[in-house]
Amino acid sequence: MNGGYAICAGLEQVIDYICNLKFEDDDIQYLNSLNKFSDKFLDYLKTFKFTGDIWAIPEGTVIFPNEPLLTVRAPIIEAQIIETMVLLLLNHQSLIATKSTRIVSAAKGSPVMEFGARRAHSIDAAVLGARAAVIGGCVGTSCTSTAQKFGTIASGTMAHSFVQSFDSEYDAFKAYAEVYPDDCTLLIDTYDTINSGVVNAIKVFNDVLLPKGYRPKAVRLDSGDLAYLSKKVRKILDENGFEDCKICVSNSLDENLITSLLEQGAKIDSFGVGENLITAKSDPVFGGVYKLSAIEKNGEIIPKIKISENVAKIINPGFKKVYRFYSKETEKALADVITLHDEQIPDNNYSIFDPENPWRKKALLNYYCKPLQEQILKNGELVYSLPNLESISKHCKDELNSLWDEVKRINNPHKYYVDLSQKLWDLKNDMLHKA
């Protein structure tokens, strides 16, 4: 994405897929009908089970370009069979989680709710996209299936069709308030926000809620000039004694529009974000790739490299690890370094350099570092404890707090260092020159 960082998401679904992958009789029959596969291969699929090892970066972790999010060490046929689903699941949810963090950041602490199910590209895109949005910081989702399945908050308000189905706007608001007196949020822009919507909302607050001892939760705006209308509505609510009534807005919001609204002094307490979040409309493709970087023969790991005229598509060879360095003084992330799997990181004084411009060097001092990947599967068996969605979301928040604000800027972010170890850089260049 066009930002300074990304968020890793989708690992839980990758694990579920790989651990439960098998080929049923009807799958074998279909593949046989294509007349493309040998009986030996089809017999192999009948008893297929993934038997390899997998290491991965946990969900909610901040990631950067060229870093190995997931490493598979397995018989090559097993590694290739899982490729498409691994990419699909990681790319999709990492995309939405990243977009979510940008939108949540723009909201400057005001709650953001995911409202995008009706604009998602499929059922799975709605359900898993909402999950990813919560990882990125959304406080809830209007997709009740996601809330039920993953234990997050189901949030939403009335629809315009609900208001239209009554003889009057007042009648609609009154009926809603009588059913939800303790959680009353009224949609006030169906007809005329200022001359009708907020007026009828206040009448219902006085006629229904106050006599029962309740206070209104919020009003919602879903159209029009949100900056102007929110200021007018705030003034009217305050003048009528409802200073505690929140204002929620929606309507094709994204991080840029939210930033603009707040810069204009809009009186907004929360945001409902739909299509621009659930589709990551501004940058709808996450470019994760799945490449062979080494093979193992007789216990020896032999590095491999893919070469391209496009420098960005030249992979880093070998069986790798990635480490993140933190300042002991500030606890902020300093740089990431990709190494070969058998390298050791010294306790202090580590020199990093720009892989594209190796004369640009920097000495890291007074740091601590940690490997980003954890082992997930060993010999095909799960050895990793899956965190719940709340824990993943908290981890994401902690990860973002470890970055300098300059790296998190929505526009023109500072470039975070992702460097290669000297050993890996030498290996890569040697292989390029010999190719």
Task: Annotate each language-model stretch with its function.
Residues 1-182, 210, 215, 291-435:
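Ordered alpha/beta subdomains of enzyme catalytic regions
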Residues 161-333:
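Glycine-rich phosphate/ribose-binding loops and adjacent secondary-structure elements
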